[in-house]
């Protein structure tokens, strides 16, 4: 079986759990005799390609404009005006006419999608101000990729909203079935204040797909209830964790204090403010504890100011974003790992912490809570319960030891090979259905 897979990041160049999940998944699929071509906007050349072929979208020469391809209506929805500003190039037809008239009068060139020309796009593969433009151009390249690989894949698999338009376009031009993977919804990222553009892309992708894979039942329910996707079309496949050699080397600790770690994006979804409030409560009882916030995000300055106001800055450490070996080192230095997410579709980090013999505290509002018994679970908003859980794990070694030993047994059974086998059955089902049409 051959899969054309569209992603936005791939290790070692990642911004979060999405790339890590994609890597584990492709390894698992390879062991289930599935051949994966993994397309990314920007490949660096140092990606591990032992289990998958990584295709760099920036190397693909695509036909842009009125091509009769599967991406034309996507381009119509996402028109681009090249001006020196931070404006996100995702506007309505009416707004486009207004901007076009204004810039034509000014004598500046406005590109129109009614003309076709060949072009090779240079993608950043990041999450910058021109993200929507890159999403649309990725769909244009996806058409060309599908044409170039005609007859070389049986199914298309697209990860998260960034690649959904690419998946739709590839499906239209190839006629192959489409599976979209929902790793995190816009409701997870933004609460009720959703970005309507992102929501529209998510909804379009899931309704165009033959199957939707959700990373948890929590996410599955959101997909069904918030996006109107038929329940029989949505399948839950939980994520897993990869065990690699050489993860047992203990770095020098340097301090005798207990270390409690938060590792993730410092943004609303991850609940960093609840971690800070709980830390302040713990420090009133046990002063010899250090709290580490490993990550970056839009709430960083807010969190730093709150730590200062609470008078606990001398007990707090901000490492910035960590990746690869630094993540493993951070876990090995930790006595407790905390994931207080407001809404977490799954959450691979607790599995990585448990793999490193660290007891974990997770929010009940997380997908990973569905597969873990030996993790302390609290409501994200219950700061008192979170503080009590941290206190218990650092003050009672026998309790922490039980969670470590039982947790390691539990997480050892969460294998990517098993998750990939479930994904393969989804592929087989949509391929069979597609042949009947």
Describe the residue ranges of each PLM region.
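Carbohydrate-associated surface elements
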Residues: 218, 240
């Amino acid at each position: 079986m051959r899969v054309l897979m569209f992603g936005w990041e791939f290790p070692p160049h990642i911004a979060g759990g999405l790339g890590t999940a994609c890597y584990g998944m492709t390894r698992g699929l390879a062991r289930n005799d599935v051949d994966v071509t993994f397309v990314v906007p920007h490949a660096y050349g140092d990606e591990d390609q032992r289990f998958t072929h990584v295709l760099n979208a920036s190397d693909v020469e695509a036909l842009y404009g009125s091509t009769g391809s599967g991406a034309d209506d996507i381009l119509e929805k996402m028109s681009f005006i090249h001006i020196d500003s931070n404006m996100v190039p995702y506007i309505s037809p009416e707004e486009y006419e207004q901007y076009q008239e204004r810039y034509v009068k000014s004598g500046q060139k406005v590109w129109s999608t009614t003309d076709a020309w060949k072009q090779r796009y240079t993608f950043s593969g990041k999450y910058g101000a021109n993200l929507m433009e890159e999403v649309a151009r990725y769909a244009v390249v996806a058409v060309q990729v599908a044409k170039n690989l005609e007859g070389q894949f049986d199914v298309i698999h697209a990860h998260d909203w960034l690649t959904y338009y690419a998946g739709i376009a590839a499906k239209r031009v190839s006629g192959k079935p489409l599976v979209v993977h929902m790793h995190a919804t816009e409701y997870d990222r933004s609460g009720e204040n959703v970005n309507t553009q992102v929501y529209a892309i998510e909804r379009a992708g899931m309704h165009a797909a033959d199957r939707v894979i959700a990373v948890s039942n929590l996410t599955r329910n959101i997909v069904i209830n918030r996006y109107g996707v038929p329940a029989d079309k949505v399948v839950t496949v939980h994520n897993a964790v990869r065990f690699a050699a050489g993860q047992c080397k203990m770095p020098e600790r340097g301090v005798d204090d207990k270390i409690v770690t938060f590792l993730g994006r410092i943004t609303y979804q991850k609940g960093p403010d609840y971690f800070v409030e709980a830390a302040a409560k713990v420090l009133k009882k046990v002063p010899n504890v250090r709290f580490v916030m490993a990550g970056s995000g839009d709430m960083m300055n807010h969190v730093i100011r709150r730590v200062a106001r609470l008078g606990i800055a001398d007990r707090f450490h901000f490492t910035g974003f960590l990746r690869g070996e630094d993540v493993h080192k951070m876990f090995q230095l930790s006595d407790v790992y905390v994931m207080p997410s407001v809404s977490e579709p799954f959450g691979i980090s607790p599995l990585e912490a448990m793999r490193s013999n660290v007891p974990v505290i997770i929010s009940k509002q997380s997908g990973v809570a569905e597969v873990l018994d030996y993790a302390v679970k609290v409501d994200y908003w219950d700061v008192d319960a979170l503080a009590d859980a941290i206190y218990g794990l650092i003050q009672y070694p026998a309790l922490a030891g039980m969670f470590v030993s039982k947790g390691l047994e539990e997480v050892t059974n969460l294998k990517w090979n098993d998750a990939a086998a479930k994904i393969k059955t989804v592929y087989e089902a949509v391929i069979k259905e597609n042949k009947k049409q």
